[in-house]
Structures are given as structure tokens and as C-alpha cells.
């Protein structure tokens, strides 16, 4: 089992590419075959397959084979490490922003 930091890094790396983010966003609306994604994004089939492999390696998507086609869909649990990371820092920043607001109010008096 990989560490939380390793999982976060894989997700950040996978979503750093605009094409992969667009593919991931498209898959949030439903399952799609590689050929459908190729047509939708005007990207070569090998490039789409490579992007999907990266997303799959990060745990963000899963694929199922049906005949010669592979259909991909979002893995809902795949984004959890990123959600946990954001939640941790959200608490940190909320606390610090609140302190800053209090300081600014004191300075205005």
C-alpha cells in the first residue's frame, strides 16, 4: 500500500496536464470508450490511451474491456487522497485568515 503522500503526488501529477484534466472531467459525466474520447478531444488514440493509463495509475479511473473496446469511468474513491489533503490545508488557512481578520480589525480601531 502506498503512502498518503505518494498517492497525493500521483494524483497531482495526473491532473497537472490539461488534456488529462479534460478527459477526467468528461468521464465524470459517464463512461466512455477510448475511441469516443479520441473523437471528443481531437487527440490521437495512443495519446488518449497514455493519458488514461496515467489517470488509472493514479487511481482516478478504471477500465473494463468489452470485446475490443475498453470503456473507462471515474473511480469515485480515487480522488479521496486529494480531498483529504485539501481538507487539512483548508482548516489551516481558515484559522490563519480568521487571525488576520482579527488583527486587521484591531488595527482599524
Predicted regions and their residues:
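Short beta-strand "wing" residues that participate in macromolecule-binding interfaces
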Residues: 63
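Short, hydrophobic-biased segments on the C-terminal half of alpha helices
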Residues: 52-53
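Amphipathic alpha-helical dimerization/coiled-coil segments
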Residues: 1-7, 25, 80-109
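N-terminal helix-turn-helix DNA-binding core of bacterial DNA-binding proteins
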Residues: 2, 6-46, 66-80, 84
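Glycine-centered, phosphate/nucleic-acid-interacting loop/turn motifs that mediate DNA/RNA or nucleotide
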Residues: 59
Amino acid at each position: 500500500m502506498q503512502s498518503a503522500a505518494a498517492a497525493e503526488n500521483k494524483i497531482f501529477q495526473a491532473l497537472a496536464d490539461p488534456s488529462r484534466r479534460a478527459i477526467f472531467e468528461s468521464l465524470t459525466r459517464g463512461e466512455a470508450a477510448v475511441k469516443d474520447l479520441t473523437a471528443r478531444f481531437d487527440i490521437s488514440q495512443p495519446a488518449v490511451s497514455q493519458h488514461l493509463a496515467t489517470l488509472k495509475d493514479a487511481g482516478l479511473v478504471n477500465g473494463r474491456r468489452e470485446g475490443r473496446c475498453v470503456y473507462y469511468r471515474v473511480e469515485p474513491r480515487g480522488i479521496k487522497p486529494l480531498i483529504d489533503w485539501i481538507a487539512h490545508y483548508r482548516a489551516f488557512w481558515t484559522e490563519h485568515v480568521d487571525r488576520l481578520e482579527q488583527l486587521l480589525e484591531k488595527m482599524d480601531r
